[in-house]
Amino acid sequence: MAGRTITRADLCEAVYQQVGLSRTESAALVEMVLREIADCLAKGETVKLSSFGSFVVRDKGQRVGRNPKTGEEVPIEPRRVMVFKPSSILKNRINGRTGKAAGRE
């Protein structure tokens, strides 16, 4: 059940339609928000958006992986990964649950 992909341009248009800023101002606003989120994540900070979810940066240590074709062991370097943890409100909305029943999980 794949839906449509929303792009930056779509977000800018939505801000333009709903907030009443000019298209240029709407695009600048969306870019500022996305840049701020990216800058915070690059510094290793968690970005929590109430009723939406949290973007969390995690450090993964070095480990040994395996080449699936040859079976040879390959070292995987330490790295940082970003994960998104949706809020329970967003999870309920995605699953079509609303109201009091949604809050009882």
UniProtKB/Swiss-Prot annotation:
Keywords: DNA recombination, DNA-binding, Transcription, Transcription regulation, Translation regulation. Gene3D superfamilies: IHF-like DNA-binding proteins (4.10.520.10). SMART domains: BHL (SM00411). The keyword Transcription regulation applies. InterPro entries: Hist_DNA-bd, Histone-like_DNA-bd_CS, IHF-like_DNA-bd_dom_sf, IHF_alpha. GO terms for cellular component: cytosol. This protein is one of the two subunits of integration host factor, a specific DNA-binding protein that functions in genetic recombination as well as in transcriptional and translational control. This is Integration host factor subunit alpha. The lineage of its organism: Bacteria, Pseudomonadati, Pseudomonadota, Alphaproteobacteria, Hyphomicrobiales. The gene is ihfA.
